């Protein structure tokens, strides 16, 4: 038995699962709340529980896999280390003229003479003196460098020389060379601005992921788990943590990718739609030939369209912990904001039940009835005094928003201040959610049922309906929303620009197909050609009904609630490298390798040289990424175009060779140690809680 430990840090929960890699069986699973102020707290709790539930000794774990939203969140929130972007051969006037400066993802940008043309020819000598001056000037000022050369994907010589200069002039960090990212290492595709932006984002993320992996490693070591640590990339493959620290941009969309891989493993479906509904969001992605469908144009993260190929996922703010509100016209709205369910917070703070009773006893519901706020920490740098005062008031326990709104000390602006503190994850808001609705309906009874019932009564009174009818409507609306988003994703993948608001007829037909117009004489039915695999903790409650609306078979596999954690260990190590061959006139051909360019008299000789040069390098990289038993395949794509009036003749434009290295993760050798029983695991759990 080879035991692997999968960990996923989600928006609401951190999941851990123990998987027997030999049989594929899930041995145990556990959850803990994600602790944003320190992710390792939630990781420690979830891992200790999984070990305890599975009766597994820490030294029996042979591999650890981690999927994390950290890189994605850091990009969206604009966080990252201090970096300098060195641009070789770029035209600063052109960048300014077309407004590309804002697209470079770096404030400190240095333009250096040099660069190449589309054929890989040097257009100007590299300004090594300018590069040296720029690097020395930033000693002690930056945490990483990013380098992007004009047409460096055709000839990376200048990028490689500047990298060597940085590593020579900058002091190493903890025994490793100073962090440097080169654009040609992240992508082989053309787009100078996006490539520079991707390199800059990667450099910004290096300190963040380095800190996470270091603290995760300490947490695991503290629990006695010393197995190798792997990280999930955005395409669902695994790499060793040390590799991920150099290329953290490749971990964007790591969580959704792990969920698709986990869904494939648990459900055994090679062709399916995967709907992962969690506490905060719902992710929708496609499985094709047993692999996550990848967006070849690059992952979109916030406002940035990177050049990193990652899972093609559609994300919407809909989950079990989505806030349920009524708008000014009495219509029910679910999400996109995530809040703590009333039932969950009341289980820890039973005084909330008395407050809800008092609000129900009032002649009319007060503003923000059924909502509470709780401080998650003491403060943060840069807070205004009014914010600090508000945090102190929320530190003792959940405070009703109605009290804050009516307070002479804070007044109506308190709620606006609260939203700013929520955005910084300093405050947690609690309100009625779909999870509360399931408690009222008796379909889920984990926390305080009375608090959920009182919250339903408060909201039902505002809407003029019964609590049971309200909760049934909420559950149905979540299912309808999930079905709508899958239709949106499917049509978008097929090239249809979906604009429901601008197409009332299409929207009317969809509403009738999803049961939103029960009195209509027109009955519509949709039929999805592929099954739906539903995963996530609340999947069973909502997605089977969504599948009914879409005429699809729904599979909710065992352990669906921890599919992301399972996906963090069942994937393989996959590395790709693309090389190009381009004609130089009629009888010469240039091979563009990542290490430089070479010229040949025929295409076939160039192909043979690539087959000789690339596999050994790629095999070694796969080994460094944590793979064993590596196999390498090559795909060849010749590009031609018809010659006008040429009687069917075609002209040769070039050849793309894609080399793919696939291996299984290398696992650690477990050493027999003194047995640590359930009691000791529980003691670890107590200390980390």
Residues of each region from the PLM?
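N-terminally biased helix-coil "hinge/interface" segments that flank
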Residues: 1-672
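Short, low-complexity, charge-dense intrinsically disordered segments
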Residues: 671-689
């Amino acid at each position: 038995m080879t035991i692997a430990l999968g960990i996923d840090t989600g928006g609401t929960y951190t999941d851990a699962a123990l998987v027997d890699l030999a049989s594929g069986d899930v041995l145990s699973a556990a959850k803990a709340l994600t602790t944003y102020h320190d992710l390792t707290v939630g990781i420690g709790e979830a891992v200790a529980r999984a070990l305890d539930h599975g009766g597994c000794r820490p030294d029996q774990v042979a591999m650890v896999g981690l999927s994390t939203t950290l890189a994605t969140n850091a990009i969206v929130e604009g966080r990252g280390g201090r970096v300098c972007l060195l641009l070789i051969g770029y035209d600063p006037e052109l960048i300014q003229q077309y407004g590309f400066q804002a697209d470079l993802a770096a404030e400190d940008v240095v333009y250096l003479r040099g660069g190449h043309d589309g054929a890989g020819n040097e257009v100007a000598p590299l300004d090594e003196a300018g590069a040296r001056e720029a690097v020395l000037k930033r000693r002690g000022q930056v945490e990483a460098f990013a380098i992007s050369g004009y047409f460096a994907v055709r000839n990376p010589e200048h990028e490689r020389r500047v990298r060597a200069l940085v590593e020579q002039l900058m002091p190493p960090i903890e025994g490793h060379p100073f962090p440097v990212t080169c654009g040609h290492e992240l992508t082989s595709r053309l787009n100078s601005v996006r490539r520079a932006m991707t390199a800059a984002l990667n450099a910004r993320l290096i300190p963040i992921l380095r800190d996470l992996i270091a603290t995760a490693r300490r947490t695991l070591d503290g629990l006695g788990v010393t197995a190798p640590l792997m990280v999930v990339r955005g395409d669902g493959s695994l790499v060793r943590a040390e590799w991920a620290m150099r290329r953290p941009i490749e971990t964007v969309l790591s969580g959704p990718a792990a969920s698709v891989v986990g869904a494939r493993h648990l459900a055994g479906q090679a062709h399916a739609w995967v709907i992962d509904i969690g506490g905060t969001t719902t992710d929708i992605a496609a499985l094709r030939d047993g692999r996550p469908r990848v967006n070849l144009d690059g992952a979109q993260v916030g406002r940035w369209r990177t050049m990193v190929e990652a899972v093609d996922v559609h994300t919407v703010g809909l989950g079990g912990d989505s806030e349920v509100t009524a708008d000014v016209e009495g219509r029910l709205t679910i999400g996109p904001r995530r809040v703590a369910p009333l039932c969950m917070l009341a289980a820890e703070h039973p005084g909330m039940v008395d407050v809800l009773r008092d609000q129900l006893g009032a002649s009319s519901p007060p503003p923000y009835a059924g909502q509470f706020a709780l401080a998650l920490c003491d403060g943060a740098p840069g807070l205004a005094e009014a914010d600090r005062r508000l945090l102190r008031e929320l530190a003792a326990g959940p405070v009703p928003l109605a009290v804050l709104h009516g307070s002479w000390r804070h007044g109506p602006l308190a709620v606006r201040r609260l939203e700013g503190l929520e955005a910084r994850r300093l405050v947690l808001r609690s309100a009625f959610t779909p999870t509360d609705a399931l408690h009222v309906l008796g379909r889920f009874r984990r926390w305080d049922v009375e608090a959920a019932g009182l919250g339903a009564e408060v909201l039902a009174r505002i809407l003029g309906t019964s609590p049971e009818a309200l909760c049934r409507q909420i559950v149905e609306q979540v299912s309808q929303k999930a079905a709508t988003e899958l239709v949106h994703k499917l049509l978008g993948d097929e090239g249809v620009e979906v604009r429901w608001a601008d197409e009332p007829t299409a929207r009317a037909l969809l509403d009738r197909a999803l049961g939103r117009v029960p009195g209509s004489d027109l009955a519509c039915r949709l039929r999805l050609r592929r099954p739906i695999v539903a995963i996530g903790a609340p999947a069973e409650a909502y997605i089977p009904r969504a599948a009914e609306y879409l005429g699809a078979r729904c599979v909710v596999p065992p352990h669906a609630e921890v599919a992301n954690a399972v996906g963090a260990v069942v994937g393989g190590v996959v590395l790709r490298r693309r090389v190009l061959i381009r004609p130089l006139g009629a009888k010469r051909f240039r091979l563009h390798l990542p290490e430089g360019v070479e010229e040949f008299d025929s295409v076939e000789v160039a192909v043979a040289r690539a087959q000789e040069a690339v596999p050994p390098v790629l095999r070694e990289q796969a080994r460094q990424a944590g793979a064993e038993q590596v196999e390498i395949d090559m795909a060849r794509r010749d590009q031609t175009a018809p010659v006008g009036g040429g009687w069917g003749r075609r002209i040769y434009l070039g050849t793309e060779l894609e080399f793919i290295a696939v291996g299984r993760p290398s696992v650690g050798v477990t050493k027999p140690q003194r047995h640590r029983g359930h009691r000791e695991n529980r003691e670890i759990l107590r200390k980390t809680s």
